[in-house]
């Protein structure tokens, strides 16, 4: 199958790769089907969560453990049921990144990670009840440090 996206042009994809968000994503509740688009360069930590239902919508995402290795949170029973989680090793964790014109002000939403069960391709954006994580967590310096230590 293929879609014609605003940011990437025509993309070929396998229907088995579609990630289904039953409730959509907060603010985009009418969008349920997404793809993870990866830049194949090793030095590129960012990916894109591309909506299939509205191909003008794509979110920049990153695994938060790239820049914050100790990023952890509790997985509650509601999330286990919603994503049919049997093994946490099958979970993919991403956070949405905002990259403004002034790149040094780049932030990630650590308060609301996107959790995907890779076993069944079900996804959900969880809202954490945790004051430690910010909605607008600055990440540029942490990314620089992560890559300088690699």
From Swiss-Prot:
The keyword Cytoplasm applies. Keywords: Bacterial flagellum biogenesis, Chaperone, Cytoplasm, Translation regulation. Interacts with translational regulator CsrA and flagellin(s). This is Flagellar assembly factor FliW. It comes from the Bacteria. SUPFAM superfamilies: BH3618-like. HAMAP family: FliW. Belongs to the FliW family. It is found in: Cytoplasm. InterPro entries: Flagellar_assembly_factor_FliW (IPR003775), Flagellar_assmbl_FliW_dom_sf (IPR024046). Acts as an anti-CsrA protein, binds CsrA and prevents it from repressing translation of its target genes, one of which is flagellin. Binds to flagellin and participates in the assembly of the flagellum. One of its GO terms (biological process) is bacterial-type flagellum assembly. Disulfide bonds: none annotated. One of its GO terms (cellular component) is cytoplasm. Pfam families: FliW.
């Amino acid at each position: 199958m293929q879609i014609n996206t605003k940011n990437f042009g025509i993309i070929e994809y396998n229907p088995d790769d579609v990630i289904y968000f039953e409730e959509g994503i907060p603010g985009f509740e009418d969008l349920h089907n997404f793809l993870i688009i990866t830049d194949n360069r090793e030095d590129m930590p960012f990916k894109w969560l591309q909506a299939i239902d509205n191909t003008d919508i794509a979110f920049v995402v990153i695994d938060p453990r790239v820049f914050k290795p100790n990023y952890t949170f509790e997985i509650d029973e509601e999330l286990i049921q919603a994503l049919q989680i049997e093994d946490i090793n099958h979970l993919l964790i991403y956070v949405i990144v905002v990259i403004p014109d002034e790149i040094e002000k780049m932030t990630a939403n650590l308060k609301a990670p996107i959790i995907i069960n890779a076993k069944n391709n079900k996804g959900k954006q969880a809202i954490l009840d945790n004051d430690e994580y910010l909605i607008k967590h600055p990440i540029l310096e942490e990314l620089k440090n992560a890559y300088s230590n690699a």
